[in-house]
Amino acid sequence: MKSDIHPAYRQVAFHDTTADAYFIVGSTIKTDRTVQYEGKELPYVPLDVSSASHVYYTGKQKDFAKEGSAARFNQRFGSFLGAMKK
């Protein structure tokens, strides 16, 4: 086997900046940034979305049948379209 071809596997601090939550996960991602977390200096990767802030996991998702563009269209023009069918 060839030596020195595998990426370094180490603990990395992923930071969800939206929810201000940290996840410590083993990863091979390359980053030059570091952060002090629980007394350890770890490689740092900022995230925009994770399970801490994604609407599917937080339960704050919108019901598109009630709040979507189709519902707004039906609210504006539904009576007009219903009258034309008669």
Curated annotation (Swiss-Prot):
<dbReference type="GO" id="GO:0005840">
    <property type="term" value="C:ribosome"/>
</dbReference>
<dbReference type="InterPro" id="IPR042105">
    <property type="entry name" value="Ribosomal_bL31_sf"/>
</dbReference>
<dbReference type="InterPro" id="IPR027493">
    <property type="entry name" value="Ribosomal_bL31_B"/>
</dbReference>
<dbReference type="GO" id="GO:1990904">
    <property type="term" value="C:ribonucleoprotein complex"/>
</dbReference>
<dbReference type="InterPro" id="IPR034704">
    <property type="entry name" value="Ribosomal_bL28/bL31-like_sf"/>
</dbReference>
<dbReference type="InterPro" id="IPR002150">
    <property type="entry name" value="Ribosomal_bL31"/>
</dbReference>
<dbReference type="GO" id="GO:0006412">
    <property type="term" value="P:translation"/>
</dbReference>
<dbReference type="GO" id="GO:0003735">
    <property type="term" value="F:structural constituent of ribosome"/>
</dbReference>
<keyword id="KW-0687">Ribonucleoprotein</keyword>
<dbReference type="Pfam" id="PF01197">
    <property type="entry name" value="Ribosomal_L31"/>
</dbReference>
<keyword id="KW-0689">Ribosomal protein</keyword>
<protein>
    <recommendedName>
        <fullName>Large ribosomal subunit protein bL31B</fullName>
    </recommendedName>
</protein>
<comment type="similarity">
    <text>Belongs to the bacterial ribosomal protein bL31 family. Type B subfamily.</text>
</comment>
<comment type="subunit">
    <text>Part of the 50S ribosomal subunit.</text>
</comment>
